[in-house]
Design a protein with these regions (language model features):
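A structural signal for short, hydrophobic/glycine-enriched beta-strand patches
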Residues: 1-140
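A transmembrane-helix-recognition feature enriched in membrane-embedded lipid enzymes
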Residues: 136-163
């Protein structure tokens, strides 16, 4: 079994997926097509119109032919840090200690990988391309905010880890 952790992304208010979430699911499917033993670990518990990010991703994967047995939903987390910790708990409870594939937007990869490594995981990065239709200023902001967020989130997960 190879866990493929797919980090969620905000949904539209009607519960439909935004482009970032669709890109992440496409990247996960592409990776999973090359690894038949994939277990898709879907994160994101912020509901919109009764749907969580994990629910929407599961629906997309099921529609693409992935079996329900190959899907594990983590639908209780409110942010990236919560997701990393919750996935760690889920996988450790199942006795898993091997490497994990990490699927998220390219700009978000550094933070997700850093947190999971701080939690003791060996990671394989599966970046989803980010939108190209954003303004230059918005793209700069999206990338620059990841640096302080990475430092902060790694400190949070290390604090959690050492309190265990």
């Amino acid at each position: 079994m190879l866990p493929v952790i797919v980090f969620g992304a905000a949904l539209y208010p009607d519960g439909s997926p935004r482009p970032a979430l669709l890109a992440r699911v496409r990247a996960a499917l592409g990776f999973g097509a090359q690894h038949s033993d994939s277990l898709y670990v879907l994160t994101g518990g912020v509901p919109q119109a009764g749907w969580t990010e994990a629910d929407v991703m599961a629906d997309l994967l099921l529609s693409a032919g992935v079996s329900e047995e190959a899907i594990l939903r983590e639908d209780g987390s409110a942010d990236t840090c919560d997701s990393a910790i919750a996935c760690t708990k889920l996988l450790r409870a199942r006795g898993y200690g091997g490497p994990v594939a990490v699927v998220t937007s390219d700009f978000h990869m550094m933070r997700c990988v850093a947190m999971l490594r701080a939690l003791g995981w060996i990671t394989v990065s599966v970046p989803a391309p980010s939108r190209t239709d954003l303004s230059r200023r918005r793209r700069l902001w999206v990338h620059l905010r990841e640096y302080p967020a990475t430092v902060w989130d790694v400190l949070l997960v290390l604090t959690w880890r050492f309190r265990q």
